[in-house]
């Protein structure tokens, strides 16, 4: 009898595929098509990280909250989902819908029900790496939840934030450096506590986090929003099409992030593979290819991408229509915003909409001027340091890009020491200034020592600006 029912289910599926119709199969057929992975003793784990703070970075926490709702609806247990977010957005005075976070113009609230595992200053590098390793004793604060996985388990890590060559932002100092992250992933593999691990990364220059650093053979498959040399993009921003509701003055999401999340919501994760999603997300994130867009990349064990998404994200029974899809039905935006300019978009729209003569307009004007002044200070300081160190060759040395497949820098300790030397004299690099991490890495690759950097930074920066963006109150970024 079972064989007959199974054959009938298969027959109906093939008829639907040929005719183009969508057939909702009965639960017994669903069981027939369910991958064998669901029948083993494996457990799904997830780590979701929003690595920023500030209302102008609304989109990162919106991405992560939306990802949580997707996994929860997919049946991933709450106790197995670890969430890192500063949690300063939902109840922020700038939020036009207090207590609510949306990730798309017509989206539902994605904030309600999201666990507050690690918030505020608990969102830091040490806690994140301890969570991935399952090391409860190394935690400081938070819920104490870690990835306590076993050898048959599957892990999904999603990180949304600002980035720069070789570095990922954190709302607390220091930032997360590529070598430290990859070292922890290697330790996790050596511990024998997972069967496969998938890492989705949203950040500028995110390809540099894994390029030349993540080897094959660790059963890790990673995709990134951009290659090692380009920005990633915010989306659903004011002035775009589609645009957020009129009361919002900030971007609601990030292009790569909403691409994979919205794809997951519209397709059957029991049949869609990691590779199929990669191709769809790559197409949507590429945008126009001229005015905007980035190159989604993949690293590690590419063969792992043949696995079904259900293995890592679960599946929502409402989406189990078993329709194979090779076209992304979601319309790409007409225009998007460079990740590094999203804060300026917020400040500018805040200024434009504020009543003339109001305290809000004065505040917004100050925020725009402070942000622009900080950018000029960092850009000019790095350029001048390059000239002081390398003379007329400074610009060429600072902007040199290593061949594909090579890591950003040979000596990561050197990179961190030069970052600290710069910040001691010139102030914080900030979420904007980490775009210059390649320039500092190239100083190391050219043999520059910390003493030389100190001397050059002292000449380039007689004083540290008083701007909040330059403040070192939170400590050094390395």
Curated annotation (Swiss-Prot):
Q: What phenotype is described for loss of this gene? A: No macroscopic phenotype, probably due to functional redundancy. In plants lacking all vacuolar-processing enzyme isozymes (e.g. alpha, beta, gamma and delta) shift of storage protein accumulation from normally processed polypeptides to a finite number of prominent alternatively processed polypeptides cleaved at sites other than the conserved Asn residues targeted by VPE.
Task: Quote the tissue specificity entry.
Answer: Specific to vegetative organs, especially in senescent tissues. Expressed in developing seeds, rosette leaves, cauline leaves and stems. Not expressed in the siliques. Also present at the branching points of the roots and in vascular tissues.
* Disulfide bridge partners, by residue number: 237-251, 414-444, 426-461
Question: Biological process GO annotation list?
Answer: proteolysis involved in protein catabolic process; vacuolar protein processing
Q: What induces it?
A: By senescence, wounding, ethylene and salicylic acid (SA).
* Protein's cellular compartments: Vacuole
Q: What is the lineage of its organism?
A: Eukaryota, Viridiplantae, Streptophyta, Embryophyta, Tracheophyta
Q: Which InterPro entries match?
A: AE, Legum_prodom, Legumain_prodom_sf, Peptidase_C13
Q: What is its EC number?
A: 3.4.22.34
Q: Give the organism the record lists.
A: Arabidopsis thaliana (Mouse-ear cress)
Residues marked Required for post-translational maturation and enzyme activity (site): 251
Question: What Pfam families does its record include?
Answer: Legum_prodom (PF20985), Peptidase_C13 (PF01650)
Gene Ontology cellular-component annotations = protein storage vacuole
Signal peptide interval:
1-20
Write the protein's name: Vacuolar-processing enzyme alpha-isozyme
